């Protein structure tokens, strides 16, 4: 499971997800990618499940990059606890994902294999996604 080794603040506020992603919104390493089209929190367990789904399908036939990292702690109070008495303890970690953020990148496989692997991974994620290729970004205006 992905989580930070150490953090400056143990508990953080929930925050808002406004606007689109301004960083991580293009393919930096691979030839194919999975791009989020809606916003949401992706937990470390969901990232791991999607990673396993991709690796099982490509069978060591390519390289996978995970472009998000769960660095936000989510707190929960124990069950049947009365209101008040402070904020709960950190239970799991999430990555905040905005629209246009590239979540996974893949190279070393054909487009058909990459498309199916990303489709399997998208079923594990709580955000809507789309399959993108390097060609898509070159047509849009050559972002890197």
UniProtKB/Swiss-Prot annotation:
One of its GO terms (molecular function) is tRNA binding. InterPro entries: Ribosomal_uL16 (IPR047873), Ribosomal_uL16_bact-type (IPR000114), Ribosomal_uL16_CS (IPR020798), Ribosomal_uL16_dom (IPR016180), Ribosomal_uL16_sf (IPR036920). It comes from the Bacteria. Keywords: Ribonucleoprotein, Ribosomal protein, RNA-binding, rRNA-binding, tRNA-binding. It holds the Pfam family Ribosomal_L16. One of its GO terms (biological process) is translation. One of its GO terms (cellular component) is cytosolic large ribosomal subunit. SUPFAM superfamilies: Ribosomal protein L16p/L10e (SSF54686). Belongs to the universal ribosomal protein uL16 family. This is Large ribosomal subunit protein uL16. The gene is rplP.
């Amino acid at each position: 499971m992905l989580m930070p080794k150490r953090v400056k603040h143990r508990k953080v506020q929930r925050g808002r997800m406004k606007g689109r992603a301004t960083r991580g919104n293009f393919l930096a390493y691979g030839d194919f990618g999975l791009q989020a089209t809606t916003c949401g929190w992706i937990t470390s367990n969901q990232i791991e499940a999607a990673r396993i789904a991709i690796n099982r399908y490509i069978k060591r036939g390519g390289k996978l990059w995970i472009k998000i990292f769960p660095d936000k702690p989510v707190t929960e109070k124990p069950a049947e606890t009365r209101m008040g008495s402070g904020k709960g303890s950190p239970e799991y970690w999430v990555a905040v994902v905005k629209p246009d953020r590239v979540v996974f990148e893949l190279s070393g496989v054909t487009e058909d294999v990459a498309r199916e692997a990303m489709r399997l991974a998208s079923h594990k994620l709580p955000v809507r996604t789309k399959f993108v290729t390097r060609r898509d970004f070159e047509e849009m205006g050559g972002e890197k």
